[in-house]
């Protein structure tokens, strides 16, 4: 059923799983291809993962199916704005406002579009991965690659050209390609420093003639200043007695609301209730009076009355086609009241469902925070009901027996159950980390070892587990730091001392260049993802220091007298970027 797929999409969207949400909406569209709401929802999901071109196509389909629906133009504007077309975005928001002039979402979108159109191009930050990635912008990149004999042949390799274009589109994606020696060589060329890379790479063997660098066209949006001619002032309109009375009642209702707000701030809740009730009697076309009164009921602990007011606000808001933010606010207040009641009823499901509905109306941080709190409360409640240290110890012993028999997957199952029964036992995380290490699941092993240390910092097994994982991952400096941290609690621990000795041997071996080219490349690739390494390589002073090391050894020795420079050089040596011979 299309409704079922839509509900799954809404739930995934509320949880921030936008790719999954788009898939569910696609399933729903296959069942109901004429439903404009489904295209609108999928457009929002696609925009959330920056697939703006696809989001634009869905938004255009939404408007085509339902041209008198204001939210469709909101989706259209958001997609245009994501693609950098501020003018088209503004036009879309204006069309939506023509249908619903009071829509706050469209007003905010139009303001953002106008601001984007007027703003000068933003410069990227100068540090980190983005700063290095920015070096790949502009035609000088192609000139340098074409003029260097070592890199010229890369221009004839389609896969490498695709990587370069991806880095130009998204500078932060550079880390993804640093394991490719060609990219490391081009990075070395752009930084104007010599980075140690594997020699005689197969990628550089090509006799194909170099191609001229492609000319990149920089497209700049044209902006036209329009001078608005003053519109003639209309003649005063005659107002009927009925219309005049309606305006007076609305004005009186707003005064009652302001008085209610003042009483609420003073925590005079009974008086606030009276003012909001009077405002409702004067004007039943503004659901904020209901949501405000609901907020007072929450403070008074009258959760059933709060829920009743919120339900009325949602129903009346639908009838009036009120701003979806107001409807979302009513649902959030209802969810808050339900979460309060759940502390006694121990049923958080309906509160969670209500928060999810609120997020489909309008996604805002407060509602998302309350949803996360309700989900955590539900999880904690389930954990409390399942807690049993005695059964946890029994499962841990079963896991230990399976570990001795080298049945590691079975051991993990028992450790999992032990953790569910008692999540505060550091020993179980240590044992499970050992299983993961035996199975080669290093990230999981590292996570368990860190959890073990978090639960009991004095338990040295946690440090030996973590150090072992880092050693197997060839992160010898980090492993040594872990072993040293464990020695603070047990200075004579032989396992920790042996771990430090092994790390020192590997570090010295790497510093002498006594490792394979494959290991060197892997070490450099990991190092280039370290923000500290990235900042060192983009520091103009350090780049000059590295050039002096290659061209002026005497000046390089002077640089090493600066403790800060010496520390950074040692960091590059440890990372394999610089080698000593």
UniProtKB/Swiss-Prot annotation:
GO terms assigned for molecular function: Hsp90 protein binding; preprotein binding
Compartment annotation: Cytoplasm; Nucleus
Keywords from the UniProt entry: Acetylation, Chaperone, Cytoplasm, Nucleus, Phosphoprotein, Repeat, Stress response, TPR repeat
Name recorded for this polypeptide: Hsp70-Hsp90 organizing protein
The UniProt record lists the keyword tRNA processing: no
Residues of the STI1 domain: 148-187, 530-569
GO cellular component entries: cytoplasm; nucleus
Biased composition regions of type Low complexity, renumbered to the chain: 199-209
Disulfide bonding pattern of the chain: none
